[in-house]
Structure formats: structure tokens, C-alpha cells
Amino acid sequence: MSSTKTIGIIGGGQLGQMMAISAIYMGHKVITLDPAADCPSSRVSEVIVAPYDDVDALHQLADRCDVLTYEFENVDADGLDAVIKDGQLPQGTDLLRISQNRIFEKDFLSNKAKVTVAPYKVVTSSLDLEDIDLSKKYVLKTATGGYDGHGQKVITSADDLEEANALANSAECVLEEFVNFDLEISVIVSGNGKDVTVFPVQENIHRNNILSKTIVPARISDSLAEKAKAMAVKIAEQLNLSGTLCVEMFATADDIIVNEIAPRPHNSGHYSIEDCDFSQFDTHILGVLGAPLPAIHLHAPAVMLNVLGQHVEAAERYVTENPSAHLHMYGKLEAKHNRKMGHVTLFSDEPDSVVEFGKGIDF
């Protein structure tokens, strides 16, 4: 890159913080917009303290920055459209709108990107649930909002319909047939508007709908891994992607099914900071700046463990007992239960021997 840029990041959580660190290493200046003055990004960047939907604050950020990006998908797309200049938000707001609404997302994945998704139907009220086949298992998800399992109801029998009907009557939903999968996996892919680069396939283990452990490379066949990466690239190319995208998938014995996309760096890609020659945050910054993207090389098999609020002391003990482990703490002031406080990355080719911090204790 020929010159220093000022990059505006909407969102000052851990993802914004790690984006900022990558940008600063490359010589750029970072300004963050976040409602909290003591957000994680405040440790590494200037912060404009304001709500995300504050149009005046968005104007200020846009006026002071060459390029804008966001660390999460629940950003006011209309507000951004009102303040950005042409080309100032390389990720665009179309990607935001797709990822903010599961109905739009399913339509994009199945009909435009033409990748395999679980059978689904749009649900506008409980009337749409009256004729479902209860010999099958389903997941009902609100079309908008919801994360880490919020806004979802699993339907396995008629006993679940009362709660499902209430959810369906409260908001538009998507009803997905439950996938009998072997593994949950994800693929990180980054683009610069022209080209893409793809990371290794990651295997993800969730507890209470929160990511607990990521294993890289995923323990699937080479042919399935290549299929997963090809599907992620296909999605990225259909989006004309700038920046980093995570594609979450299910791996069955002989197929890959796409679950959802996140239009930003992702928790499951944090291992890349130590384990790849360029991290998902590096390629995100390169991508939104339109810079050339490198091929990604994995240094060694690795495991990433999430550190939740109830795990902080255990994680600190762990790294004193395993000094080759890499501990990242995000600088959040209050260690709330199930709040993501940090992560640990450890090189290991025996992933089952790396025990999650809360396993058998507090999941």
C-alpha cells in the first residue's frame, strides 16, 4: 500500500479491537464508533462514543475516515447509506441486509449463490406451523435478531409447539429441517472486490449455543474440505466480497450444508492470529483497502478455546501451566457469566487432549 489511511470501525468489541490492531501494524490510523467509552477497542484506538444508529456520529466517523468497516452485522444499513460516500464502505450495505435477515439470507444462499442449505420455509405466523410433519425435527429461528441461540426454538414433538407458536406469532421466522450432521465447521474467506483468499476449514464445538472450541484443520476428508472451501469461495464471489466473511456449515458423512454467513471476522477464525501467516483480521483490512491478498498457509494443527466470564481464572492458570499457549484477553471490565472475555490458542495435533475450560463444570 502506498499511503496511510484512516479506517473507521463501527463497533468496538473484541472483533473491532483485533481489526484495529491489524490496521495499526500496517501503519494505518483507526477511529472506532461505540456506545461505551471503555470498550475493548478503546485500548488501541480513538473512540467516538455514541449509539450505532446516531446519524450525526456516523457522519462524523465518515467525514474523518477514508474507509469504513463494521465488526458486527446489526448495524443500521439505512443510516450508513445516508452518510457514506461512494466506495467508502467496500463491504457495502447489501451484505448487511442479507446477513441481518434469515429470509433474505436463505434466499441468497439457495437461489443466488446456489449452495446447499437445509430444507426451509418462511413462517409469518403460527398458522404456518399447523401442517408440519412432526416425524421430523426442526429449528424455528426469528428472521431478524438473535445470536448464540437466542430467538430460536427446537421442535421435536407436539409438546414444543406452544413455545414455537408464540415465537412464530411474535416475529417473522424461518423454519429449518434439522440436519443430522457429523461436525459443525466454518470457512473464513476474504476478498478485495476482485480476488479472494480462503482459510483452512475449521471444526467448531458449541456449548449452550456458544462456541467453545475450534479445531484446525477440521477432521473431515480432504474431498469434503475442498468442497467446503469451494462453496465459501462461490458465496464470496457472488457477493463481490470486500473484507472477511465466515461461512458456517454442517458436515455430514458425504456432503456439506451451508447454515449461515457472518459478514465479518469470526470467533472461529481467531486461531489464525498465531497459526497462519496472515490472520483473518489482516486479510479483512487488506480486503477493505482493495490491496492484494496473500494465499493463506497454516503453520501447524491447532486448537482455540474460548474464555468466558466464568473461565477467566482457569484460563490464566492454564497458560502458566502451558507456557506455549497464546492467551488473548479483550480488556472487558466485567467478567459476566457466558460473556466472551478472551481466547487461548494452542498448537496441538491431539485436539481431544485439549480440554475446554468449562467442560463438565459449568456448561
What is each residue range found by the language model?
Residues S3, L286-F363:
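Peripheral (often C-terminal) accessory segments that flank ATP-dependent C-N-forming ligase machineries
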Residues M1-Q100, F104-D107:
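ATP-binding N-terminal substructure of ATP-dependent carboxylate-amine bond-forming enzymes
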Residues L167-I220, E226-V258, A262-H270, F278, ...:
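Phosphate-binding core of ATP-grasp and ATP-grasp-like enzymes
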Residues I24, I84, S110, L134, ...:
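Anion (oxyanion) recognition and catalysis
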Residues V123, Q152-S157, I188-N192, V216-A218, ...:
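Short beta-strand-to-turn element immediately C-terminal to the catalytic PLP-Schiff-base lysine
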Residues Q60-L61, I132, L167:
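Structural alpha-helical scaffold elements that stabilize or flank donor/cofactor-binding regions
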Residues Q91-K153, A158:
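A conserved helix-loop-beta module that forms one wall/lid of the active-site cleft
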